[in-house]
Amino acid sequence: MAEYTHYFIQYNLTDIFYEDVNIEKYSCSICYESVYKKEIYQCKEIHWFCKTCWAESLFKKKECMICRCIVKSISELSRNRFIEQDFLNIKVNCPNSFKYIDENKNNNNKIKDLENGCKDIITIGEIEKHLKQCKFTHIKCKFIGCNKIIRLNQVEKHEKEQCEFRLEYCRYCDTDGITSRSLENHYKECPKFIVKCSENGCTVQLERSQLESHIEKQCQMVMIDCPYKIYGCEQSNRFPKSNLTQHLSSINHTLAMGSMIESQSLQIKETNIKYENLLNKINKLEQLETESKCDQLYDKFYQFESKIDKKLNNLQLDLYPKDNQQPQQKEQKEQKEQKEQQERIKFDDLFEKVSKVNSYFINGCLLKYKNRWSISNYLTESRKYRKITSPSFKIYDKKFKLVIYPQGKDDGSYTSLFLKSDSINPIKVFYKFVLLNFKDESKNLIFKNKSIMDKEKSVGCHYFIKSTEPGKKPEVWLKDDSLVIDFSIEVNINNDIKPLES
């Protein structure tokens, strides 16, 4: 059962008496409180008071407060259970017979709920037990957002039928947790809600999410224009899509069709011209970008070269003094040798920088490309196909791909690996293949070379690895049945290599 917050009505016993009762008859004559939940003691003269009042009186004076008979302690008094029990047997109404007034938290103004209140008549002694099981007690609705106070025997109806904050389930889209007050709005937007086609005359019912597609592609009642209207069709008014066949057969559209074909041909021609212009612009931009990069690298190279020449001249002046100068002292000679050593170090640094820049220039700009080729299900693929080709990739405007022959291109005992290009001109390439060893990285299989890709348009290694190795040692050369090859390529894009002819 769900946990509820209970709201109990605050009451005095006089509020719930079923019949008129003289409450003074059951009240302590010292504190004037009723004997409810109190122990009543009496002296030998039958003068009774509550235990609390007896204790306070005897603390001050050892005598009865009325007859003054000697009473040394409460233990000398007798319990008056008759008055206690007589009070507990008084008949009362259940406190839940009243309305719970939310605005009056203390319920000072008791209003009998004749229609929905508890009708039980009980005794004062039965009040606590009765309230624990009374079905008319007041509780707060369990749903978040609802602040209504209802009776326990009405909670099921309220939560299932009346509460606006009860959680509902959309039977169309399987969404739950929707409050009852929001369900109607949800139905107005639910993509799975069944709706009728909005086109006049169409009786199709379908999910809201399919409505747009239905109207666009399937609905026969949607109003359309003749497809040849802009090319001269006589029919100017729109008509249902279902009438299109009848319209096309009833009117001769030959002239309109000819006009349409001519118009579309012109559009295609204009599109092709725009495409060619855009392609030329792209090629020019790529060429300008490459030339700009090359110019920048050349500038750096000449700057470094100029610095080196200047340093060399300075060194030469210092190391070879003029003939008319006097011989230097020993100390000055040592200083000059030390200075020479420092200049040599600086020279070496500059030379190294120039070498790095110069590495970018081999008859033009050198572009570098690195990547990894992972061949899934290698053992299965190698038995199934003579060759396996990688996805193609571009370096500048040249397209390349890797091709592996698991059983060799020429010799079946060795696997072959090649780099191929679709370039129509010779290309100078520097390439490196690395077959990963998953047991020991230091034992990776490496092949590198530099070649000119001419008419063959492919370079590589015929004897890369024994064709049986991956199958014999899968734990070494395969990872999750994948053969992995790292490769790097350097391409000279501005070379003017021409094949020799004789």
From Swiss-Prot:
It is found in: Cytoplasm. Residues 261-295 form a coiled coil. InterPro entries: DNA-dir_DNA_pol_B_CS, MATH/TRAF_dom, TRAF-like, Znf_RING/FYVE/PHD, Znf_TRAF. Residues 368-489 form the MATH domain. Keywords: Coiled coil, Cytoplasm, Metal-binding, Repeat, Zinc, Zinc-finger. Probable adapter protein and signal transducer that links members of the tumor necrosis factor receptor family to different signaling pathways by association with the receptor cytoplasmic domain and kinases. This is TNF receptor-associated factor family protein DDB_G0268444. It comes from Dictyostelium discoideum.
